[in-house]
Amino acid sequence: MVSFNATAILLVLVANAFSKPLYVPEHCVGMSGTLFQACIRQTMVDTTGMYTNSAMSYDGTTIPFDRDGIVHQDHYTDTKPTPLSDVGFSV
């Protein structure tokens, strides 16, 4: 019985170590539906490049984000802007 409990605890610890938490920004918590999706998308666009060097592309223009004092011309991720009309808002 002791070995089963130890195995179960070890399995839970390994599962927690490899799980990735879902981060929801504080200002998006009270929202739901398309408003929640738009809030998450906007937060992703606003924080592009905060933790890694990447760039956004908009109408064929690449905007590099410089976080280490080095401007990277190559971008690692492409973030396509989503018009508000596509997520249920009228502008």
Swiss-Prot record:
The keyword Signal applies. Residues 1-19 form the signal peptide. Keywords: Signal. It comes from the Viruses. This is Non-structural protein 3a.
